[in-house]
Swiss-Prot record:
SUPFAM superfamilies: QueA-like
Reaction catalysis annotation: 7-aminomethyl-7-carbaguanosine(34) in tRNA + S-adenosyl-L-methionine = epoxyqueuosine(34) in tRNA + adenine + L-methionine + 2 H(+)
Name of this protein: S-adenosylmethionine:tRNA ribosyltransferase-isomerase
Gene Ontology cellular component terms for the protein in this record: cytoplasm
Single GO biological process annotation from the record: queuosine biosynthetic process
Enzyme class: transferase
Gene: queA
Organism superkingdom: Bacteria
Coiled coil segments of this chain: none
UniProt xrefs under NCBIfam families: PRK00147.1, queA
Length: 341
């Protein structure tokens, strides 16, 4: 399959730059994955598509305020560091700007020494492995010194950083939000529970690879980035019970989907586990875990458009996207949502 097969025209004016005042007031485009039928609603109406006994799976990762601005100790030159992934202990994979002059052994100073980062390995494309030195708890230092790392297509400043977190965000570790979950409010989740729908949590820490464009023409040649995930025994038991009773597993977001499908690819049923996944889901993939998917609208020619095309089909997805453009839906992280079921 060619990357051009997953392209569509998106006017820049439809890229949402700020979140709506109320999370669940965003629009919802419901797509029947088997027939292609489209229904236009608001997100709060999603509850009408859930049935008692279904399980809704949410990613409880929390975005770190992981963009730091500091100085190179040796020269005082300004430097920006974006923390991506914890490797081990206090060692982190990061992106640096500018990166060229940061070599092994060089040290960076943030917040008058509240965080000091020492380069221990040089990677490609501005990447480095940095060893962090700080007193106390890293999350507290980041809350004090760091900025929220918004996606590259969002140009406006975010007044309230909590709007780039889900209301159930818990496990700190992401460089980007699992944006399908941004539409849920505590009130909506409570109403969903009252309907007899189960809520389950997984964790997948979203890396910046989610924004990296596909650089090959033949998508079979694309190499996916890896992301850390985990599932608890409680969640595994609930999902197995849901499947055994003939009810549906509805995934909130592509991150939850990648976690669930990774586990069911590797095991005959859901199990408590953790690890790294580089699963690449595109048309032809056999889904074993999910029966429904809530997701935002994704970038043209992205692996996420391929994922949703695999769950429904490419023709239905591109038709839905064209209709969403025509009706001026809001796109990407702060945009509107789809329910594919």
């Amino acid at each position: 399959m060619n990357i051009e097969d997953f392209d569509y025209h998106l006017p820049e004016s439809l890229i949402a730059q700020t979140p709506l005042k109320n999370r669940d007031q965003s629009r919802l485009l419901v797509l029947s994955k088997d027939t292609g039928e489209l229904t236009h609603l608001h997100f709060r109406d999603v509850i009408h598509y859930f049935e008692p006994g279904d399980t809704l799976v949410l990613n409880d990762t929390r975005v770190m305020p992981a963009r730091l601005f500091g100085l190179k100790e040796e020269t005082g030159a300004k430097v920006e560091m974006l923390m991506l992934t914890q490797i081990e202990g206090n060692d982190w994979e990061v992106l640096l700007k500018p990166a060229k002059r940061i070599k092994k052994g060089h040290r960076l100073n943030f917040g008058d020494g509240k965080i000091v980062a020492e380069c221990i390995e040089e990677l490609e494309q501005g990447g480095r492995i940095m060893r962090l030195h700080y007193e106390g708890i890293l999350q507290e230092r980041l809350d004090e010194l760091g900025d929220m790392p918004l996606p590259p297509y969002i140009k406006e400043r975010l007044d309230d950083p909590d709007r780039y977190q889900t209301v159930y965000a818990k496990e700190s570790g992401s460089a980007a939000a699992p944006t399908a979950g941004l539409h849920f409010t505590d009130d909506l989740l409570n109403k969903i529970k009252q309907k007899g729908v189960h809520i389950a949590f997984i964790t997948l820490h979203v890396g910046l690879g989610t924004f990296r464009p596909v650089s090959v023409e033949n998508i079979d040649d694309h190499e996916m980035h890896s992301e850390y995930y985990q599932m608890t025994q409680e969640t595994a038991d609930l999902l197995n019970k849901t499947k055994e009773s003939g009810k549906r597993v509805i995934s909130v977001g592509t991150t939850s989907t990648r976690t669930l499908e990774t586990i069911r690819r590797d095991h005959p049923q859901f199990v408590a586990t953790s690890g790294w996944t580089d699963i690449f889901i595109y048309p032809g993939f056999e889904f074993k875990a999910i029966d429904g998917l809530i997701t935002n609208f994704h970038l043209p020619k992205s692996t996420l458009v391929m994922l949703v095309s695999a769950f429904s089909n490419k023709k239905y997805i591109l038709n839905a996207y064209h209709k969403a453009v025509e009706m001026e839906y809001r796109f990407f992280s702060f945009g509107d949502a789809m329910l594919i079921i």
